[in-house]
Amino acid sequence: MKLNDIWSGNVNAAEWEAKGYELPKFDIKAVREKTAKEPTWVHFGGGNIFRAFPAAILNDALNTGKYDRGVIVAETFDFEVIDKAYAPYNNLSLCVNLCSDGSIEKKVIASVTEALKADYQFTDWQRLVEIFKNPSLQMISFTITEKGYTYNDADLARGLTPVFAMGKVCALLLERFNAGQLPLTVQSMDNCSHNGDKVKAGVFAYAEKWVADGLVPAAFLDYLKDETKITFPWSMIDKITPRPHEKVKEMLATDGFEDNDYIETEKHTFTAPFVNAEEVQYLVIEDNYTNGRPPLNLGGALYTTRETVDKVETMKVTTCLNPLHTAMSIYGCMLGYTLISAEMADDDLRSFIQKIGYMEAMPVVTDPGVLNPYEFIGAVINRRLPNPFMPDAPQRIAMDTSQKLPIRFGETIKKYLARGLDKSNLVLIPLTLAGYARYLKGIKDDGTSFEPSPDPMLAELQAIVAPLEVGKAEQDYSCLKSLYSRADVFGVNLYDAGLGEQIEGMVKELYAGNGAVRKTLHKYVAAR
């Protein structure tokens, strides 16, 4: 069983389907021919998340028979991905959704019609220019990570041949401008708040520099700013797509699926002909398009207003997912866990995040309307976090915790204060913040040391709690005032919020000695 059998037509469909593989229900070659002539969508970033989500939902849309164009992928960073993960398989891939019950769903993705290297050294660049000049193009999109939208003075100074992704995109938009100021929507699909603004800032930085240097007419910048021509909508995307999993490779090999080799590029991109991802997924997109759009709603995407996209993001990062992640990661590191899924088998930790979510954060949740917060958090607790296929670690999530606490917990505390709600309902959120002062010591509950995860404020905050010792009977905890009064770390001055003394008391319990973290966690969770 090989992907190229599907491309050649030499495929025993009954065998594939008997083994649980969903095959494309559309004419792959007809879609490619149509897309080559009248492209509608170019996506930048050919990594695992693209194949597992945007390409997969377009595949679902094509399977309905109500749409007939594919997506053209362009890689700006790691060109080996095109050579090794796309070209040998005629741009086909296998999407494997990993279910929390240990089963897997297998779907052949055939929606990618071309895979191009987005750089001037390749002939693919001329193909991209040709596509950008085509009036049929409706949308370009991105999964290049938040770092992919950055730029620097050196690249801005390279003129019309920059090397950073945003510069290349600006150069292609210049081609579209020169072809008659054709309309287009520039859509980020990266997992960061207000992602459309990040693309916009990057593109505008290059355009403004080029205008200032006299390389392009001022009308080009006017074109980019004209929202009847060019828009930069926001979106919220949520789907975990880890590197190819050994267990998945073994399951596919048992089926007789032969395209299961791991690929590691020189730039250390980990990929394969298959991509594995969690089963749960969300894509909510601001419906602000200037030249029509691919009907991704046929594959499950939600189109809505910018305000609603922002509400979905707020629901996720302040209530239904991110606070739970951080709480269990702080305590998970101290209790010696290395897998989030393993933490979910710990009754104290599972109850801890359930009660934070349902009892403390939910009373002030932002309800976006298009997604139900209770269904969302239910999927997080019952399907996403316990998923045995997800190799996520508390140590990874604990990275940059000082930068995350203001949003993940500070916003909830602010809402309690603004609405005059009873702060006595806040017990486990304060326990999370108390746990941070214990986490900073880098000592597990069994007394052994651990390395706190990288954080730009780690040394500064560790210095504040340096006078404290785990297991010392009598000690001065006044240093905590310098920590919990920091609105830059917690979103609010916790003493002004009326929570500082409560948190101090919890810290004292956590510092009592070996076993105190477990004892304190159990005490407060059980009493809730």
Q: Where are these predicted regions, by residue range?
A:
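Substrate/ligand-engaging "lid" and interaction regions
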Residues: M1-F44, N48-R528
